[in-house]
Regions:
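Second-shell residues forming the walls of enzyme active-site clefts
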Residues: 1-5, 13
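Residues immediately flanking
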Residues: 6-7, 45
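Structural preference for alpha-helix termini/caps and helix-kink/transition segments
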Residues: 15-17, 21-211
Length: 211
C-alpha cells in the first residue's frame, strides 16, 4: 500500500514538527492501539491536495463510522460479481476524492436493511476499493478489544439486570454500566439481553480490572 499527501500535515491544528514534540509515525499510532483501518479511514477523510489535521475527534469519528459499517456487513464476504457503487467509483475518478467516496459508502450503508446479505456484500465490495472492511464484524470487534473477552462482563450485567427487576434497585446495574462506559465499552441492553463491544477510547486495562 502507498499513501500520498501533497499538503501540510497537522496535529490538533498545529503543524506536525519534531520541534513541537507532536511528530509521530504510523507505527507509533499502531503501538498506541489504534487499529490500522482507523488510521486509514482518518487519512481518507481528507483529500490528498488539502492540509490534513490528525485529531482525536477524527479518530473517534472514524472508529464510530467503522463500527456502523461493520455492523451492517456483519459476517458477509464481498461480492465481486456485483458492480461497485457508482458514486464511489465516480468520486475516486474525480482526482481521488476519497472524502466523497467515504460519504458515498455511508449513504449506501444507510439504505441496507437488516438481513439483506446481498446488499451488505455489495457494500463490502465497494468499500474494498478504499481498502476498507477487509474483515468480518466479529473479527473487527475482536481486534478492537485486543483479544479481551467481554462475554463474562456481559453475563454479569445481565444477571444484575434480572435481580434489579425483581428488587427494583438498579444501583448495581447503573454502577457496572457506568464503569464499562468509562472504560470505552459500548453497552447495548435490550429485551433479548446485553451486548458489549469495544468503542472509541477502549481501555483494555480498565476492562480487565472490572473482571
Amino acid at each position: 500500500n502507498v499513501w500520498l499527501h501533497n499538503e501540510m500535515l497537522q496535529v490538533e491544528g498545529k503543524k506536525m514538527s519534531k520541534s513541537l514534540g507532536n511528530f509521530f509515525t504510523v507505527r507509533d499510532l499502531l503501538d498506541q492501539g489504534i487499529p490500522g483501518e482507523v488510521i486509514r479511514y482518518v487519512f481518507l477523510m481528507t483529500h490528498y491536495r488539502k492540509p490534513m489535521d490528525w485529531t482525536a475527534e477524527k479518530v473517534a469519528e472514524a472508529t464510530k463510522t467503522l463500527d456502523t459499517l461493520y455492523e451492517v456487513v456483519g459476517e458477509t464476504s464481498p461480492d465481486r460479481s456485483q458492480a461497485p457503487n457508482p458514486e464511489v467509483v465516480a468520486a475516486l475518478a474525480d482526482d481521488l476524492n476519497s472524502s466523497a467516496a467515504l460519504h458515498a459508502l455511508i449513504r449506501q450503508a444507510g439504505t441496507i436493511r437488516p438481513g439483506d446479505t446481498a446488499a451488505a456484500a455489495g457494500l463490502k465490495h465497494s468499500a474494498g476499493l478504499l481498502g476498507l472492511l477487509p474483515m468480518t464484524g466479529e473479527e473487527w470487534r475482536r481486534l478492537k478489544s485486543g483479544g479481551i473477552d467481554l462475554s463474562g462482563l456481559g453475563a454479569r450485567l445481565q444477571e444484575l439486570r434480572i435481580a434489579a427487576k425483581a428488587s427494583k434497585d438498579f444501583s448495581a446495574v447503573d454502577a457496572l454500566k457506568s464503569a464499562l462506559l468509562a472504560a470505552g465499552v459500548e453497552v447495548r441492553m435490550t429485551a433479548a439481553g446485553v451486548d458489549l463491544a469495544p468503542g472509541a477510547g477502549f481501555d483494555a486495562e480498565a476492562v480487565e480490572a472490572l473482571k
